[in-house]
C-alpha cells in the first residue's frame, strides 16, 4: 500500500495518478489541482514517483509547470537520481519502489485559490535527441504538499 494515496491531514495534502501499463507517454502530463488552505504558512512541495523493477534508468528527467491562480506559470526542468552508482534504488520498497523527490521547499503560496501542477516525463535513451514515446516501469506519479512551519508570517 502506498502511503501517499490521496490523503489529507493537518498540514498535509497529497494525490497521485496511475499511469498506463504501456508506459508514461511523452508530452502527456499528469495534472493536479492543489488547494492551498493557508497562504501564510511556508510549505514544501514534493513529487512522488512509484516504479517497478522494469524501470530501465538510474535517473529521471521531468518538466513541471506550476500555474498560479493569477495566470502566471513557472516551468522547471528537473533531474533526479533514482539509483546509486551500484544500482541500488534510492527510494523505499522492494518490488515497487517509492521516491519522494524534493520540488519546492519552504515556499509561500500567496493565494488560497487552486494552483495547477503538471508533470511531464522528459527521458531520452542514450544517444537519442528525442524523448521516449512511452517511459516503461513508472506506475504512478503524484505530489505531497506539507507545511514546513506552524508559525504564520
Predicted features by range, described:
Residues 3-6:
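C-terminal motif of bacterial Sec signal peptides marking the signal peptidase cleavage site
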Residues 39-47, 107-126:
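Noncatalytic modules at the cell exterior or secretory-pathway interfaces
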Residues 15-37:
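Post-signal peptide N-terminal segment of mature Sec-exported envelope proteins
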Residues 30-49, 57-58:
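Contiguous beta-strand segments within globular domains
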Residues 8-11:
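Bacterial signal peptide processing site
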Residues 52-54, 98-109, 120-134:
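Short acidic/polar inter-strand loop motif in beta-rich domains
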Residues 80-82, 90-107:
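A beta-strand/beta-hairpin structural motif
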Residues 62, 66-67, 125-153:
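Exposed low-complexity, polar/acidic, P/S/T/G-rich flexible segments that act as propeptides
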Amino acid at each position: 500500500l502506498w502511503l501517499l494515496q490521496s490523503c489529507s491531514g493537518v498540514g498535509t495534502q497529497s494525490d497521485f495518478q496511475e499511469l498506463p501499463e504501456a508506459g508514461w507517454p511523452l508530452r502527456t502530463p499528469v495534472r493536479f489541482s492543489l488547494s492551498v488552505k493557508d497562504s501564510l504558512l511556508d510549505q514544501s512541495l514534493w513529487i512522488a514517483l512509484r516504479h517497478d523493477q522494469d524501470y530501465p534508468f538510474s535517473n529521471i528527467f521531468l518538466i513541471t509547470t506550476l500555474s498560479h491562480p493569477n495566470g502566471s506559470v513557472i516551468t522547471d526542468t528537473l533531474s533526479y537520481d533514482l539509483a546509486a552508482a551500484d544500482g541500488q534504488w534510492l527510494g523505499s520498497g522492494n518490488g515497487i519502489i517509492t521516491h519522494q523527490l524534493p520540488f519546492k521547499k519552504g515556499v509561500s503560496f500567496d493565494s488560497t485559490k487552486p494552483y495547477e501542477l503538471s508533470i511531464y516525463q522528459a527521458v531520452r535513451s542514450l544517444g537519442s535527441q528525442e524523448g521516449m514515446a512511452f517511459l516503461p516501469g513508472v506506475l504512478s506519479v503524484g505530489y505531497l504538499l506539507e507545511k514546513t512551519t506552524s508559525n504564520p508570517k
